[in-house]
Structures are given as structure tokens and as C-alpha cells.
């Protein structure tokens, strides 16, 4: 329902507001923009509170139909006061839709750039993206989205380039900028009154600082817009707006640049991801990870470091099941380290095993039988049902004491002569 807030502002939401007392929103890099609205409606009006959650809300200026905020309601509270209901709405930019469903997948096409990787992640989740950074920088090694939302993953990718992500707040669609928004040049602000901020950067040895300037205006500008202030070329790195007592005032944070700490997915330390070997090259393996549904996502070859060390190891073959390990929180330092068999392979392995010696002697270990064979066709076969011995020449059974043969039937066969002697 549309409501006119004042002579220049309109709001559209599912709440049948009779009046809006105040609202404010904040728009900063690396976080969803947040809007909070305080308003009143008649207590007898039923607006279906349960339908408000996850519904859209938009605020715009009547002149030029310029949108100030367009997002989704994430929280609603109400309080009855006489004949009125006091309703408070909290909403977030539509980028929050990209921050709801954690996923796991890998990006192993290492010749692709950071921008291309971020674009694929966002667009595969139904979002939109504009890349102002990372268009020339290849990822070089695989990056992995592990138990992360698309928003968290792209934010982490951006931090590897020393930049940020910026949510879109005007389209009402899940969209973002990868890198600071490339804004327009705007008229200078008044320098009669402003605040200077000096703060330590988020990373480093604590000695680095960054300086920002806060100033107010009635005009609406956007993140990334450029302005000359105090003789310096600055950019807008923060926008906040407050409507109160019928007046809308914007407050801007101006900086020449911003430093962003490199972010990691901490769960990678000690993690192992299983997959299937697709190809082997010297002491490297190409792996289709299970988190990708067993499909290859690039042609990267992981180094193979067996758990046995450098001695007595063999490279896994195509189709073998292996595990890719991560010794730190940096997923770009993964390596293949263990090859294992599935349940059916284990059974096949134990059903038939064979050891061949250089002199042609052989030991066969079967499921129901153990067989020993010498180079001269001597053999011994042991099973649950019988024992068999054979020799192509002489077969001698000797003992220092007694030899006892006991059975229901004993058969001794000789082609030429049978001698049983006593010394």
C-alpha cells in the first residue's frame, strides 16, 4: 500500500500505515543496507502480520521517481497505544537474498579471473553483479565456497583483492557490485561543518590509520560517488539517512580509499574433501570433488603428498577415490594426500591377492583357499575342505618321530611302484 510520507516522499509496503513518524537507513560496503521505519495505523485494521515478513518495501522521492531504498522486510513489531498501533519495520537490501542458503562448491578453472568467478557464483544463485575489480586478475589456484552463502563467498573473494562488495539498494533485486561502485562526480559539499574520523585499519601491525570525513546534506548521493572536499579527491564510503520531524537529512562518510582485511573461511584448517581422480600427471592429480557432484569444475592439478612420506608410495590411478587436504585456512593451498578404496573395492581386494617372486614362486590368497607354488611346479593348497600337495618330481614326507595319517579312507596311488619300508 502506498502512503505519502511528506510533500516529497512516498513509501510502498504491505502495512496500511496512516502515518510515518520517522525512518532511517544505512548503506555501507560489505554489509546489507538496513532500513528501520516507525509508523502508526488504526488498531482495527487487519494487515496480515504474517504476510509482512519477506515482503518488499520501497521509499522514493516523488520528483524524478528516484528510489532511496528498495528491499525486503526482515522483522516487524507492533505495540497498541489507544486507538493506534505503533508498528516498527526492519528491512534489508535485496542483497540479503544472496545471504540465506549456504552452499559448497569449487572453482578449479584457474585461468578465470576473480570477477568471472564471482559472477558465476552470483548468477548461478539468481543474482546480478557488476564487477569493477578483478577483471584482469586470474585466481591462479582453486577457490572453494564451503558452507558459505554467495554473499559471504564473494565478499571473501573481494577481500583477496583488497576491495569490498557493495549491495544494490534501489532495484529491489538481489544485486551487488564486486569492488567499489564506480560513481559519478557530484557537486562539492559545504565545508562549514564536518567531522574528522581517524581510526586504525582492520589489519596490519596497528600503526596504519585511515582518515574519513563526515558531512551532511539534503541531497541524495550514492556509494562510490566522487567529490572534492578539503582540497582532496574523495569518494563516498558510507551513506546514512534520517527522516524525522518531517525533514530528511543525509550524512556521508568521505574517504580517499579504504583498507579491507583479507578474509578466510576458517573451517578449512585440517579439512579433507573427498573426490575422484580424473587425471594423473607426474606427481599431480586432477580431482572431481564430491561437493561438485563428482563433476570437474576446471583442469587444476593438485600436488600429491602421500601420508607415508617420500618412501614407497604409488600415484593413484584414474577413478581412484582420494582426499584433498587443507593444512591452513587458505583453500588455495590444498593438496592430495590419501587414496582409499570404497566398500566394494575392499571386498575385491581381499577376495583375490597374489604375490609373485622373481624365481616364479607364487602365493595366492583367495577368499576360500591359500595356494603356494614353487618354481619347479611344487604346490600346496589349503582350504576348509581339503589339503592338497603336488610335485613334478619327488615328494618326501619325513619326521624325526611319528607320522600319523588318520581318515575313514586313505588312498595312495603310484603309477609304477609303491614301497613302504621300515629301517
Where are the model-predicted features located?
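Right-handed beta-helix
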Residues: 157, 167, 218, 313-423
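Exposed beta-strand/loop interface patches that mediate assembly or binding
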Residues: 230-237, 242, 246-360
Amino acid at each position: 500500500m502506498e502512503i505519502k510520507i511528506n510533500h516529497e516522499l512516498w513509501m510502498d509496503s504491505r502495512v496500511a500505515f496512516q502515518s510515518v513518524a520517522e525512518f532511517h537507513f544505512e548503506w555501507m560496503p560489505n554489509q546489507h543496507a538496513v532500513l528501520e521505519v516507525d509508523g502508526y495505523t488504526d488498531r482495527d485494521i487487519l494487515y496480515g502480520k504474517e504476510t509482512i515478513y519477506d515482503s518488499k518495501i520501497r521509499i522514493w522521492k516523488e520528483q524524478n521517481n528516484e528510489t532511496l531504498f528498495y528491499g525486503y522486510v526482515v522483522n516487524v513489531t507492533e505495540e497498541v497505544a489507544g486507538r493506534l498501533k505503533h508498528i516498527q519495520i526492519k528491512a534489508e537490501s535485496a542483497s540479503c537474498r544472496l545471504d540465506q542458503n549456504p552452499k559448497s562448491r569449487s572453482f578449479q578453472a584457474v585461468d578465470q579471473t576473480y570477477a568471472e568467478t564471482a559472477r558465476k557464483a552470483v548468477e548461478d544463485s539468481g543474482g546480478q553483479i557488476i564487477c569493477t575489480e578483478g577483471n584482469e586478475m586470474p585466481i591462479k589456484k582453486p577457490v572453494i565456497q564451503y558452507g558459505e552463502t554467495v554473499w559471504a563467498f564473494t565478499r571473501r573473494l573481494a577481500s583477496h583483492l583488497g576491495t569490498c562488495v557493495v549491495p544494490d539498494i534501489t532495484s529491489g533485486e538481489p544485486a551487488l557490485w564486486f569492488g567499489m561502485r564506480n560513481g559519478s562526480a557530484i557537486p562539492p559539499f559545504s565545508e562549514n561543518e564536518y567531522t574528522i574520523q581517524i581510526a586504525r585499519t582492520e589489519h596490519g601491525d596497528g600503526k596504519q590509520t585511515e582518515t574519513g570525513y563526515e558531512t551532511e546534506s539534503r541531497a541524495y548521493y550514492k556509494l562510490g560517488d566522487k567529490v572534492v572536499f578539503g582540497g582532496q579527491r574523495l569518494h563516498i564510503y558510507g551513506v546514512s539517512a534520517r527522516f524525522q520531524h518531517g525533514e530528511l537529512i543525509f550524512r556521508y562518510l568521505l574517504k580517499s580509499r579504504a583498507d579491507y582485511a583479507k578474509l578466510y573461511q576458517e573451517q578449512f584448517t585440517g579439512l579433507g574433501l573427498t573426490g575422484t581422480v580424473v587425471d594423473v600427471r607426474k606427481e599431480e592429480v586432477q580431482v572431481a570433488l564430491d561437493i561438485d557432484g563428482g563433476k570437474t569444475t576446471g583442469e587444476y592439478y593438485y600436488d600429491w603428498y602421500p601420508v607415508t612420506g617420500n618412501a614407497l608410495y604409488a600415484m593413484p590411478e584414474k577413478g581412484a577415490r582420494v582426499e584433498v587436504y587443507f593444512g591452513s585456512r587458505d583453500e588455495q593451498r590444498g593438496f592430495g594426500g590419501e587414496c582409499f578404496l570404497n566398500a566394494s573395492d575392499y571386498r575385491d581386494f581381499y577376495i583375490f591377492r597374489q604375490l609373485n617372486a622373481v624365481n616364479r614362486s607364487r602365493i595366492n590368497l583367495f577368499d576360500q583357499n591359500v595356494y603356494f607354488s614353487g618354481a619347479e611346479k611344487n604346490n600346496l593348497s589349503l582350504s576348509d575342505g581339503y589339503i592338497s600337495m603336488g610335485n613334478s618330481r619327488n615328494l618326501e614326507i619325513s619326521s624325526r618321530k611319528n607320522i600319523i595319517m588318520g581318515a575313514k579312507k586313505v588312498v595312495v596311488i603310484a603309477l609304477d611302484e609303491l614301497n613302504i619300508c621300515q629301517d
